[in-house]
Amino acid sequence: MFMLPGCIDSGNEADSIFHGELITSGKSISEFTLLTSENTTYDFKQNTEGKVTVIAFLFTNCYDICPVVTYNLRHIHESLNETMLDKIEFITITVDPWRDNTTILEEWKQSTKSYWTHLTVADTQPSSQDMATLTQVWNDFDVGFKIEENTTESNTSARHHPSSYDYN
């Protein structure tokens, strides 16, 4: 026996009524430019205008939810045809730019087969324009995290605050 609940239309219009929260307007996001894992600049507005945009905030040293999120995004990404991929922009933005430089992000991208844009910054000094930009991105998307001092290289403690965002 093979069952596909919810996947077959009953033909009854009453069964097709939308259940959920209708999103009528998106969140306003500041324009920004960050650095890709290929060490090129990425203009958010230019690359996402007119597209559905899927953004994940994560870090490569995470052994908790980040690989799961990446796997799920990869599954979705791989299920889309070229026409759909032209209308959807997938982006990963690091929350650990001190560790996730372009080389590390590119290694992560290749090892996880997450073949979409991964973003970081070059200058992680607190007073740098790069960090000001990245901090503004985190603030715009209400990304919450806590920086904790590591006592060992293997310390992967992190606080994740998953949420979803609608961008216009």
Report each predicted region and the residues it spans:
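Secretory targeting signatures
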Residues: 1-14
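Short active-site neighborhood of thiol/selenol oxidoreductases, capturing the structured segment around
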Residues: 43-73, 90-91
